[in-house]
Each structure stands twice: as structure tokens, then as C-alpha cells.
């Protein structure tokens, strides 16, 4: 909700969950809204998903910063200029992976900082 701005959420759910962001389309003033999400328990089944509000369409702009890359040296999959979901895959996360989220009033900017380049995807 809009009241959650500035909070830090620690995720301790091994079975995964979905975090729904406040909806920009609902008309609530969200300019400057922000939060941080920190993974404290590995997601061992399902996924951890950050999703936009129900009335929004492709308002998430996602970027991934990774600590390591595979031998093939591929780019992180978790980068998008407009998407609905940012997904942290089960088994690819590391305790301490985090997401910084800030709203401009028209977009939700999600910066994922993860250990593994295969950990984050967007859709």
C-alpha cells in the first residue's frame, strides 16, 4: 500500500510468495514511493514474484545487477523497459539478494541485486 513507503521487507518464506506493488492507475499519489526487499531464506519451491498493481499495465522497469555470470557470459535475463512481473527463481536465489523499488508516479523501477545471473527473469 501507499503506507508501506520506506519500509524494508525481509522475505523468510521458502515456499515462495507474490509481493503486489501499489497500483499507479488507482490515482493514489505514489511519486517517491519506495521500499527494499531482502531475501533472508532461500526460496526452495515455487518463486518469489514482484508484480504490478491489478489496474496497471507494464509499469515495472526492471534492471538486474549480478555478482557472478555463467561460463557462457550471457547478459542478465531480468532487464525490461516495461513488464508486469519480476521473478526470482527457486534454487537460484541466495540469502542477501535484494530488490530496491522506487516509483516515479508513472513507473515502478525495480533494481535487483542478486548473486546468480540466472536468478531473475521478467514477464
Residue ranges and their predicted role:
Residues 1-70, 103-123:
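Exposed extracellular interaction/assembly regions and N-terminal maturation sites
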Residues 39-41, 92-95:
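Sequence/structural signature of small/polar-enriched beta-strand/turn repeats
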Residues 66-84:
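Surface-exposed intrinsically disordered loops and tails
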Residues 86-90:
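Short proline/glycine-enriched turn/loop segments at secondary-structure junctions
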Residues 95-103:
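Extracellular disulfide-bonded cysteine-rich modules/repeats
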